[in-house]
Amino acid sequence: MLVVYSSSVTDNTHRFVQKLDLPNVRIPLRLKDEPLIVNEPYVLVCPTYGGGVSLTGENSRPVPRQVIRFLNNEHNRSFIRAVVAGGNSNFGADFGKAGEVISAKCKVPYVYRFEMMGNEDDVRICRGGLVQNAAKLGLEKQAS
């Protein structure tokens, strides 16, 4: 099972993913970096940006541009099987909003959300759920 993730310079999402102890690869932070191409099913883990905009509904851009660029590649998008989102509960209704957006656009299940870098329970629940449901989610690596 592969975890593809995006993390800002705060590295909150990076720390969460490392605690999952699953094979992972990071989407490049800088748009000038070589784009990531994946060739196997994966779960996407990403942070949510722009908290609090649901009050006005304006300028809502919860999905990081690096993730948008990654998913705009049809090849990459064809391998997404589930999404996990991080965020800040101070965002209120927008907490984990990136997961909702990606789930709807890519037609994959939004399986978990965690706050900041996640706690021990988040890691246990998320990892356990992914491992236990890998076959059901289509996250097992396909034979070539």
Swiss-Prot record:
Organism expressing this protein natively: Corynebacterium ammoniagenes (Brevibacterium ammoniagenes)
Protein known as: Protein NrdI
Example of a GO MF term: FMN binding
InterPro entries from the UniProt entry: Flavoprotein-like_sf, RNR_Ib_NrdI_bac, RNR_NrdI
Biological process (GO), any one: protein modification process
Family to which the UniProt record says this protein belongs: Belongs to the NrdI family.
Gene3D superfamilies per the UniProt record, alphabetical: 3.40.50.360
Domain of life of the organism encoding this protein: Bacteria
Function: Probably involved in ribonucleotide reductase function.
NCBIfam families: nrdI (TIGR00333)
